[in-house]
A protein has these predicted regions:
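Extended hydrophobic leader/signal-anchor segments used for secretion and membrane insertion
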Residues: 2-332
């Protein structure tokens, strides 16, 4: 083959390779922009939203509806790992910024966010959680006998939400086949007894009641009487439970709250971890950044979220308020 033909063929391949490289780069760039600014897909990893949203469901997170949260680190994780540093240096962290959104955050929204209780990792590297939004900044929230009360209005149970039940089944009618037919996926028999603990919707509870000819089904009240060790509701000796607590005022940006030794535990994580202050309590006196205080003004908005699987959800009742800078987006 003549030399000039070889050169032409080689030049043709170079040109095709260049075109493909440009096309792939543009496509990857567009996908990255969509992922960062518009949408993200997520597989639900827990049962905390059963039966409204199920474990294994694929959901689409809309980031722009609340306003896209801009990237919070200069260097991607890959560069930190390549340098052999497993920590994320402070100089790589960017301040929290969010673009204008098309929607306001509202009661009952399904919100995806980074888990606020992981204080050892950058916010955007914390695990994704999905919950229902119960209370907004400035709302007054309480819970009585498992019913949330927001600004004096008692919320109805959500249609597909689950609660824990005790089922006494002396004739062993409730077997695996029955559970499968009723789509009951959580709970089981207490070893060596005819008692089952099941997480059920109201319709499932009604079906169980019809099936068992003897025995009984009733709400599992052990959760009400059981202290949740080290949880938000138990800090500072506050004897609240998952089903009965409050009232609590949800912190809002620029809201000023009185502080004392009785309520400081509710706001400790906000003051120290989310708003980066030093906090000390000495002889019933409170010091923030070495200054005596009896009040505090919040720098951000906060929210209260909960899972529809009421007795099997790690949510604000366990780890506290959700800061606005942890919110990723909305799903439906």
């Amino acid at each position: 083959m003549p030399v000039n033909k070889k050169k032409k063929k080689k030049s043709k391949y170079k040109h095709l390779f260049k075109e493909w490289a440009i096309a792939i780069s543009i496509s990857l760039g567009l996908l990255l922009c969509i992922h960062i600014f518009l949408f993200e897909m997520m597989i639900v990893q827990s049962t905390s939203m059963e039966k409204t949203i199920r474990k294994g469901d694929i959901i689409v997170i809309s980031k722009f509806r609340y306003g896209t949260r801009l990237p919070q680190r200069i260097l991607p994780e890959i560069f930190c790992r390549a340098s052999g540093n497993r920590e994320y240096p402070d100089f790589t962290q960017l301040p929290y910024k969010r673009l204008p959104g098309s929607d306001f955050i509202s009661h009952n929204d399904f919100v995806v966010f980074n888990y606020p209780g992981d204080f050892n990792r950058p916010i955007d590297k914390r695990q994704h959680y999905l919950k229902r939004l119960i209370a907004l900044p400035g709302d007054t929230l309480s819970c009585k006998k498992g019913f949330f009360i927001v600004n004096g209005q008692t919320l109805s149970k959500f249609p597909n939400s689950q609660s824990s039940y005790k089922v006494y089944d002396p004739k062993d009618i409730i077997n695996d086949s029955v559970l499968k037919s009723l789509d009951i996926v959580e709970g089981g028999t207490i070893t060596g007894s005819s008692m089952l603990i099941l997480h059920l919707t109201q319709n499932q509870a009604d079906s169980i009641k019809k099936i068992i000819s003897s025995g009984y089904i009733k709400p599992n009240k052990d959760f009400s009487n059981q202290a949740v060790e080290m949880s938000f509701l138990q800090k500072g000796g506050i004897r609240w439970t998952l089903e009965d607590f409050g009232p609590i005022i949800i912190p809002a940006k620029k809201m000023n709250v009185h502080l004392d030794t009785h309520n400081i535990a509710l706001y400790e994580d906000i003051i120290v971890h989310h708003e980066n202050n030093n906090l000390e309590v000495k002889n019933d006196s409170i010091f923030i950044n070495n200054t005596f205080v009896d009040s505090y003004t919040f720098k951000m908005n906060y929210y209260f979220v909960a899972g529809d699987n009421f007795h099997n959800s790690s949510d604000s009742r366990i780890w506290g308020f959700l800061p606005e800078n942890h919110i990723i987006g909305k799903t439906s």
